[in-house]
């Protein structure tokens, strides 16, 4: 009797399948779909990383960003460029502003266009030709009912960056994607709602600031490494650690300089 039990179990199983045939095949199809979906994800993830790496390398996305509450001078940028492991450094400006369009206000991050790092990818229109022209991200036009050729007004508030921009009104001459923003989040702000909704790109000459707010670095050897690899992370972490003592020294010098200017 014990030797015949497996056959009986098999017979019962087959009978159950015949009696519930539609449910059985439904489960089989669902299982097959789940396996195919998982296999697709496993195959797609590496391809997505490769595509992202090519895009970021093509737009020369910075490897490190250096910021200072007191700003960064040309001397600071030059000092960073002289450090071992640094391939290139470019200073840049960024400031939060309220973009005013008719009766609608939005908090935007205003960033300076750079020609060696963080290159924008044009979607429509052209690059700005003077200090009163700007690029915006594509969805800025879509969500505000605007078109290329329309004007926006930028208000930086009454704080530290009250006079950071040379003009108030700018003509939109194109839309572009910035490699600095590859997700949906745009960051936080002390202006308006406290949440940045869009980014706007201006030529460097549109800013009226004594010092850079940011310095963007490209690391030696980083271009040859996959962006999402452990080797890349280790390289950038090592460079950041190596730059820290020099950054502390430059911050002290900058602080002393600002205090001396305030006393004069």
Please report, for each region that a protein language model flagged, where it lies by residue.
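Membrane transport/envelope proteins' first extracytoplasmic loop
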Residues: 2-264
């Amino acid at each position: 009797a014990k030797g015949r039990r497996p056959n009986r179990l098999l017979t019962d199983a087959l009978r159950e399948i015949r009696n519930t045939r539609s449910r059985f095949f439904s489960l089989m199809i669902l299982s097959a779909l789940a396996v195919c979906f998982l296999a697709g994800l496993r195959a797609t993830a590496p391809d997505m990383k490769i595509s992202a790496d090519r895009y970021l390398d093509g737009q020369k996305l910075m490897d490190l960003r250096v910021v200072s509450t007191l700003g960064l001078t040309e001397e600071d940028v030059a000092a960073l460029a002289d450090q071992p492991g640094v391939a290139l450094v470019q200073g840049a400006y960024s400031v939060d502003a309220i973009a005013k369009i008719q009766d609608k206000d939005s908090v935007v991050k205003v960033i300076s266009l750079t020609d060696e790092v963080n290159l924008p990818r044009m979607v429509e229109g052209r690059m700005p030709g003077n200090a009163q022209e700007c690029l915006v991200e594509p969805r800025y036009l879509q969500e505000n009912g605007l078109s290329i050729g329309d004007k926006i007004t930028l208000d930086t508030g009454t704080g530290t960056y009250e006079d950071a921009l040379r003009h108030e009104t700018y003509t939109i001459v194109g839309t572009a994607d910035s490699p600095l923003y590859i997700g949906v989040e745009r960051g936080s702000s002390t202006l308006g709602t406290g949440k940045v909704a869009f980014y706007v790109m201006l030529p460097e000459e549109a800013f009226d600031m004594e010092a850079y707010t940011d310095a963007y670095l490209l690391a030696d050897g980083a271009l040859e490494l996959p962006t999402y690899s452990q080797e890349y992370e280790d390289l950038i972490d090592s460079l950041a650690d190596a730059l820290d003592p020099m950054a502390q020294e430059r911050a002290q010098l900058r602080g002393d300089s600002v205090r001396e200017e305030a006393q004069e």
